[in-house]
């Protein structure tokens, strides 16, 4: 399957292969298709890190990026996502990167669109490339996932990052802890155990802090930013309870002094900006997979890819 909608649809072997490819890109290996390839990034939600790192990855691979601005497209005239995607497929785009506010937007495209689609985030659903860059960061630090404890802290219910990470970390042999305000618990997520934040911080090898998803809340948060930070944030006091070799992750954007004390964002334990760096390598690996498997699915079985080292 050339599409990447969720990590749950990939085997552990496929996930590890993507991480290995990403690590090779980090070490300076390059891959180029033998002919021009065209990519369109369809972002229907605001994005800095995901959009820019996809564009960086595409340019590093020598791919041609087709500009797309949802606010200036026919979407504003009522065109559906399906028709937008089919239009780009018809004009010859080789792969599509899509972020959309609708959960599981890709289900209507799964069996009707042959062009590979990479999910860059669907509503409160999934964020596979964020999970992959988190996995790469953890793997670089610990060399394995088995036996690790990962604490996911914050707005669990509305976070696609929490959903994606909890599932894949469990499959890879890690223990997942959740900690959040009562109203933001996701009781439908079977992959973690809820504990209080102090227990989570003390037991975790990996502390994953989540941004408060204000744009997905039907009601305003019942706490002030200061109250949230005191009760559920990674404060200086809580950070002192961390294990000797534990690390801090955050998908960003970071609300400083809300989810995490500002001085901890670039502290010795933080890998937040390392995650962003790894995002480029992971997305290079994902794009390579999409184009290779997309061409195979379309009958180009005898094409050979050029690997430049």
Swiss-Prot record:
Keyword Endoplasmic reticulum: no
Gene: pyrB
Binding locations of carbamoyl phosphate: 49-50, 99, 127, 130, 252-253
Keyword set includes Repeat: no
EC number of this enzyme: 2.1.3.2
InterPro entries: Asp/Orn_carbamoyltranf_P-bd, Asp/Orn_carbamoylTrfase, Asp/Orn_carbamoylTrfase_sf, Asp_carbamoyltransf, Asp_carbamoyltransf_Asp/Orn-bd
This protein's pathway: Pyrimidine metabolism; UMP biosynthesis via de novo pathway; (S)-dihydroorotate from bicarbonate: step 2/3
Cellular compartments per GO CC: cytosol
Binding site for L-aspartate: 77, 160, 211
UniProt GO BP: 'de novo' pyrimidine nucleobase biosynthetic process; 'de novo' UMP biosynthetic process; amino acid metabolic process
Keywords: Pyrimidine biosynthesis, Transferase
GO molecular function: amino acid binding; aspartate carbamoyltransferase activity
Family: Belongs to the aspartate/ornithine carbamoyltransferase superfamily. ATCase family.
Subunit structure: Heterododecamer (2C3:3R2) of six catalytic PyrB chains organized as two trimers (C3), and six regulatory PyrI chains organized as three dimers (R2).
Role noted for this protein: Catalyzes the condensation of carbamoyl phosphate and aspartate to form carbamoyl aspartate and inorganic phosphate, the committed step in the de novo pyrimidine nucleotide biosynthesis pathway.
Top EC class for this record: transferase
Name of the featured protein: Aspartate carbamoyltransferase catalytic subunit
Record's catalysed reaction(s): carbamoyl phosphate + L-aspartate = N-carbamoyl-L-aspartate + phosphate + H(+)
Pfam families: OTCace (PF00185), OTCace_N (PF02729)
Signal sequence residues: none
């Amino acid at each position: 399957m050339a599409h990447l909608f969720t990590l749950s649809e990939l085997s552990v072997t496929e996930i590890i292969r993507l991480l290995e490819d990403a690590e090779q890109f980090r070490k300076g290996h390059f891959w180029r298709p033998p002919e021009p390839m065209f990519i369109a990034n369809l972002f229907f939600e605001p994005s800095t890190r995901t959009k820019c790192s996809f564009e960086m990855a595409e340019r590093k691979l020598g791919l041609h990026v087709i500009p797309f601005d949802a606010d200036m497209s026919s979407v504003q005239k009522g065109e559906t996502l399906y028709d937008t995607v089919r239009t780009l497929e018809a004009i010859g785009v080789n792969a599509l990167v899509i972020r959309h506010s609708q959960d599981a937007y890709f289900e209507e495209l799964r069996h009707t669109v042959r062009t590979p689609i990479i999910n860059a985030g669907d509503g409160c659903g999934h964020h596979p490339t964020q999970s992959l860059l988190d996995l790469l960061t953890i793997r670089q630090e610990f060399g394995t996932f088995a036996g690790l404890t990962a604490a996911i802290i914050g707005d669990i219910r509305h976070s696609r990052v929490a959903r994606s990470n909890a599932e894949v970390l469990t499959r890879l042999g890690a223990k997942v802890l959740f900690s959040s305000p009562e109203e933001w618990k996701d009781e439908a997520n079977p992959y973690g155990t809820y504990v209080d934040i102090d227990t989570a911080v003390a037991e975790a090898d990996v502390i994953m802090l989540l941004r408060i998803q204000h744009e997905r809340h039907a009601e305003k948060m019942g706490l002030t930013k200061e109250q949230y930070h005191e009760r559920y944030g990674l404060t200086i006091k809580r950070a002192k309870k961390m294990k000797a070799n534990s690390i801090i992750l955050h998908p960003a954007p970071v609300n400083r002094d809300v989810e995490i004390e500002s001085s901890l964002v670039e502290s010795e334990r933080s890998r937040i900006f390392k995650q962003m760096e790894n995002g480029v390598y992971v997305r290079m690996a994902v794009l390579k997979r999409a184009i290779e498997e997309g061409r195979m699915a379309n009958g180009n079985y005898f094409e050979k890819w050029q690997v430049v080292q």
